[in-house]
Regions:
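Long, charge-patterned amphipathic alpha-helical coiled-coil/hairpin "stalk" segments used as oligomerization
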Residues: 59, 65-127
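N-terminal, charge-rich interaction modules
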Residues: 1-62
Length: 127
């Protein structure tokens, strides 16, 4: 069994007028599929997506149509650092407008949070 190394609390920055959605997925094509889901759910939505790979070089894949939101998503994903986690920042839409579209992406397994309120993520670390 992996050795438990502790718990880390990650503060997720959420600028005024922005919402964040954090979830889990299991496929390398997640970013492309989430991009399509968001852009078709709400015309005019602004967003940034980041996804942490779980193997290999453990890259962070990202995309979006707003540079500020892409940077926020990348930094939040990097801070969380857990494989298969995705972070989406949205503007000009609400989570209720996109959650069903996100949940219908076949590789999405779970939504952990969708909010504009202060948010922390608790990460358990092992070796």
């Amino acid at each position: 069994l992996p050795e438990f190394q502790g718990i880390e609390v990650i503060q997720i920055p959420i600028p005024h007028g922005v919402n964040v959605i954090i979830g889990q997925s299991h496929f390398i094509k997640t970013v492309e599929d989430l991009y399509e889901a968001l852009i078709t759910a709400v015309p005019g939505i602004k967003f940034g997506i980041a996804f942490c790979e779980a193997s290999g070089k453990r890259l962070i894949r990202y995309d979006g149509n707003d540079e500020e939101l892409k940077k926020l998503a990348i930094e939040a994903a990097r801070s969380i650092g857990a494989g298969h986690v995705f972070v989406i920042y949205i503007r000009d839409a609400w989570p209720i407008n996109v959650l069903n579209a996100i949940k219908n992406v076949q590789e999405v397994t779970r939504i952990y949070a969708a909010t504009a309120n202060p948010l922390q993520v608790i990460v358990g670390k092992t070796d």
